[in-house]
């Protein structure tokens, strides 16, 4: 939870987190990550759409943590019955993974703050506090350490789309 995220961010930011980079197939990493989704998600339809044989360079433990975090957020902040789609593609010379949901989305005024460490915003789902900060700050730091980007865009017609990139493997 929160303590693990905070410890990970601290280790990441001061260079104590050791990375073990290996070449991994996107579809396998996505499938394995879904086995770690903690909450019961029978009420949610989780769909994967992944290009075959996309090999990316990553620390697989950390990238799985990013994926689990993004999918958990999508489950937590969308009503039961929502569809969550995880896509893996090769785009512009990079591996790209996106987690899309068709929930209420994130209000415009919150978007510029969601990667801040302790930011919490209000959402419409039972008007609960959306404590995005720590998890998303950690995800952002992990992806940056992989020389990638993590961005939030709106998912048409409503919902969120978190997309991150990773370097492709340099396999001949």
Identify the function of each model-found stretch.
Residues 101:
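Acidic ATP/Mg2+-coordinating residue in the GHKL
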Residues 74-75:
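Short helix-loop "hinge" at the ATP-lid/N-box region of the Bergerat-fold HATPase_c
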